[in-house]
Amino acid sequence: DGGLTEEFADKTLKIGEKLSFRRFEKVEGDCVASYIHGGGRIGVLVAAEGASDDAAKEALTNVAMQIAAMNPQYIAKEDISAEELAKTKEITIDSALNDPASLPKPILNSLFAKAVEGSVFSAEDAAAYEEQKNNKYLFNFLSEAAKKSLAELALADKAAIVENKIFNGLVEGRISKQLKEITLLEQPYVKAEDGKQTVKAYLASVNKDLKLTKMVRFEVGEGM
């Protein structure tokens, strides 16, 4: 693009340093908005279809500010590939198994029974368990070695545990929370008065036909 080349050359002359044009994105739509944050440290472009009036432009500018602040990875859940979802689930499962204290009580009780019956615990940990097993702060009385042993037992019994409905509910709840954090439309809108309105609901309140089609977020030093 000749205009872009000339603009780039002009900026190079003004700054007095050699610049390299490392990346760019072309964004098109019925409505496009941009936002620059931190003196140029973060730049955002966002595009939408379905509306192009002033209200839509203001809404997209607000959403661009949201993207700069919250750094979502996707616009909607539907944009996340099946492979990425499967990877997220596997990581979440392993994370839960490596944190026995967070496991549902029936599963945890089973792990404790195996640890005691298999003499996995040291004498001190076995005694602490017997004395404090009804204490909700039981894990405060166990050594790190005992906690590690429980995690190893959980991982060894992974195939059976993942079939447990309670465990699956725990995993799905954690995944849902993660997806809300990385998906723009599911994030709480940062300017919402009640702190609960999602970006999706905010856009619908402005214009039900306004649909985001693309977002771009660049940050200085990113990807280098």
Locate predicted features:
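N-terminal assembly/interaction segments in proteins that build large macromolecular machines
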Residues: 1-224
